[in-house]
Amino acid sequence: MTESERKQIIALIQREVIPAIGCTEPIAVALCVAKATETLGAKPEKIKVLLSANILKNAMGVGIPGTGMIGLPIAVALGALIGKSDYQLEVLKDSTPEAVEEGKKLIDEKRICISLKEDITEKLYIEVTCEAGGEQATAIISGGHTTFVYVAKGDEVLLNKQQTSGEEEKEETLELTLRKVYDFALTAPLDEIRFILETARLNKKAAEQSFQGDYGHALGKMLRGTYEHKIMGDSVFSHILSYTSAACDARMAGAMIPVMSNSGSGNQGISATLPVVVYAEENGKSEEELIRALMMSHLTVIYIKQSLGRLSALCGCVVAATGSSCGITWLMGGSYKQVAFAVQNMIANLTGMICDGAKPSCALKVTTGVSTAVLSAVMAMENRCVTSVEGIIDEDVDQSIRNLTRIGSQGMNETDRVVLDIMTHKGC
């Protein structure tokens, strides 16, 4: 691997693994509102928001940090009132109870209009227009949760990258394979990849805060209680499940707790991190081993998401747990061959799990994903692998990954449409 390629990979990871407070879809909407408000230069009197179906789906049932409320309207209101676009996915970190009350007034006065953007192919699209004093400003995010492609005030266009995105082009030229991911994680100079330890610090802290509270369905807290001893035993496996689900519980309930995200998703960041951290800590692994295992996990997720896309009908925990399965397999002493076996086992098991939006019950899916990650790693260490005569698995692990992402990005499009239709017509 050349030094240039190594630096490209590090830059890619630093773009994709970033802190986030709250579910990234409503937070990305708040970020877009903040940018439009800043461009307008005044408190908006009216805010019009147009969203792709996938953004709408992921923002309907999730808690907004620091508000005790669910859904988009309060995220939009706070983006206008206290949001700072420089904070990126921590855009709402300056929220106060007073701002929440003011935000409720904006909602009650019907100053916020949220609609589906028709006739677009983008799965991640946010368009916000803010109006005040006869002036208006527009901001558009597309392709990535923090990727602004258009900003304008009145007739003055300040940014227009709608045709081409240099950042996306750079990512496309970096062609990853599982072998390349594995080699990078094991050979990159330690000081160049030490930053990945921040994922362990932030995401473990989120889980520990969740154990102290009562968030969402409190699955993590429940698993850590009497059930852990009575049913699963006080084991590494049970701790992996409780820590991972606890962090997800807090996040989906809207706790004001930052987590380290991966590819625009906090739950993916949690699922790629905590199983690896818990396994490493409870098995006495060194700091270097933890760093390399975390890097393998997170870069595997980024690699798979390159062909899947940021949002799809496929639950993101399938991808993120595949990353953690790789990290755990390597920590168990696995070779590249066994890491590849773990990936094949994951794809054979979890492909097809639907995404029906971000919400507290995501903790259940995350727990399913990481329990399968451990199972897949154990099978791999016994040199057991789902074979190419079975279902969608190919002899070549990278082709199996492409089969997974093809199902998620193409095959499940109708599933996505039906899921959103069901979600938007409940009780009708």
Swiss-Prot record:
It holds the Pfam family SDH_alpha. GO terms for biological process: L-cysteine catabolic process to pyruvate. Transmembrane segments: none annotated. One of its GO terms (molecular function) is L-cysteine desulfhydrase activity. It comes from the Bacteria. Belongs to the UPF0597 family. This is UPF0597 protein BF3560.
